[in-house]
């Protein structure tokens, strides 16, 4: 898969900011988290915690089931004809000059699937499954659904319900010339859920705990071992180590990881001879309450007939939708 030339990226960046973003994102559901202003990994993690806690409160226990899906080679498998048909219909509906559509088609047809170097690829990929999102949330009534690009989950009361849903999802994917990969599975909610680098699980009291996955911990372990040898040998600078660790610490702070981050901050401090401190813990419980408060206020205004949009009380900092920054 090829990355676009620099000039192509500049053109697409301008097109995305001035035309494409508002055209495409208007219809997205709340639980479509990637590549959008005010969204990102933190928003998805906080939203998952809210879903799990809300499920426990409504059902009185963690006796539920999870369907976890992942689309196989998503970007590389996106069908150009289907994508362009969706984009054309959307632009016509929004009254966008079709010259922009013609320009987009030139870039789309440059490679198979969607090239990872295009800024617009993220939005086009989200749009490709937008109709699917609405089907899951509205037609199937799946309250506890979340998607981050090609990775999504559904929480339901029974395994049978999710088995039927999975058959529908497979038909949807087939119609889009996509397929789910082997990681797709149905399992008890009590087992917890791996999503975006964190393992989220419910305690007996109904609290949701979010820890870094073992694979993510192994990444920082490997990196620290490398620094222990490379820094004294002059193969890596102090500034590079600090930059890399701070990026990892920022990501890890999305979960309940303060003790873990403090442990590795001390290791890094010993290596470089400078006191490194982890970020303060993010109060995601407060974030969940803020999201709930926004929803309650929206319901009150809706009952009063006041549908004037209001800025959310909770706006997490967006993160780049790319490879983790410490890689």
For the regions a language model picked out, list residue spans one by one.
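Conserved polymerase palm-domain catalytic core
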Residues: 51-149, 154-170, 181, 187, ...
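Right-hand nucleic-acid polymerase module
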Residues: 13, 107-110, 163-164, 180-327
């Amino acid at each position: 898969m090829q990355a676009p030339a620099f000039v192509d990226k500049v053109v697409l960046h301008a097109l995305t900011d001035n035309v494409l973003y508002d055209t495409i994102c208007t219809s997205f559901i709340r639980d479509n988290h990637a590549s959008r202003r005010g969204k990102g990994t933190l928003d998805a993690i906080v939203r998952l915690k809210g879903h799990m806690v809300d499920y426990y409160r409504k059902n009185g226990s963690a006796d539920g089931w999870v369907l976890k899906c992942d689309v196989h080679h998503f970007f590389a498998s996106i069908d150009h004809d289907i994508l362009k048909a969706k984009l054309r219909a959307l632009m016509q509906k929004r009254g966008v000059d079709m010259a922009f559509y013609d320009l987009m088609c030139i870039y789309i047809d440059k490679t198979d699937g969607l090239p990872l170097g295009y800024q617009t690829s993220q939005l086009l990929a989200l749009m490709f499954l937008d109709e699917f999102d609405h089907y899951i949330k509205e037609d199937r009534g799946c309250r506890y659904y979340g998607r981050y690009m090609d990775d999504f989950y559904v929480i339901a009361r029974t395994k049978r319900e999710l088995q039927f849903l999975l058959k529908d999802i497979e038909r949807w994917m087939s119609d889009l010339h996509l397929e789910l990969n082997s990681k797709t599975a149905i399992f008890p909610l009590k087992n917890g859920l791996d999503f975006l680098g964190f393992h989220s699980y419910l305690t007996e009291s109904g609290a949701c705990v979010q820890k870094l996955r073992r694979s993510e911990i192994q990444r920082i372990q490997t990196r620290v071992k490398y620094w222990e040898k490379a820094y004294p040998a002059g193969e890596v600078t102090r500034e590079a180590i600090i930059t890399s660790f701070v990026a990892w610490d920022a990501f890890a702070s999305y979960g309940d990881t303060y003790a873990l981050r403090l442990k590795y901050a001390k290791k890094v401090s010993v290596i470089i001879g400078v006191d490194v401190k982890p970020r303060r813990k993010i109060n995601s419980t407060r974030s969940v309450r803020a999201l709930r408060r926004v929803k309650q206020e929206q319901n009150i205004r809706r009952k009063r007939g006041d549908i004037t949009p209001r800025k959310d009380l909770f706006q997490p900092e967006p993160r780049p939708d790319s490879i983790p920054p410490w890689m």
